[in-house]
Amino acid sequence: MVGLSAATLQGAPVVTQDIDLWFENLGDPKFRSALKEIGGFFVPPFGANPPQIGGEGLDLFDVVVHLHGLEPFRKEYCRSKKIRVGNVILHVLPLDRIVKSKRALGRKKDEAVLPVLLDACRAISGGKKRRRAKLLRELGR
């Protein structure tokens, strides 16, 4: 998962209308099988239209095949955060990588949300530093 939906799962106070899912290989039989299992289907790209997922209740999912400013899928996947949502573990693009991609893309709508994402990065980073310092104090270091 990438984009603002991924940022929200990491604590960023943002809203979005869709869930962006980044796929390495849309031709993978597992991708098609998973879609079929949930009653969905794949709509390949045509002209200026990007690839899409179709099916009842699936219109809020957007297919992403490339993220500007980032490493290839496999490298970014290795950096992903695992976040539990209900009974499912999701691989989520880390907040700092979302920021990097939005900066590289440079769309007005991305630039508008960057200050909020950067504040969230600082808050999350600061929280980790405080927890680490507290743990070190408790250990007497």
Locations of regions flagged by a protein language model:
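Compositionally biased terminal segments of proteins
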Residues: 1-141
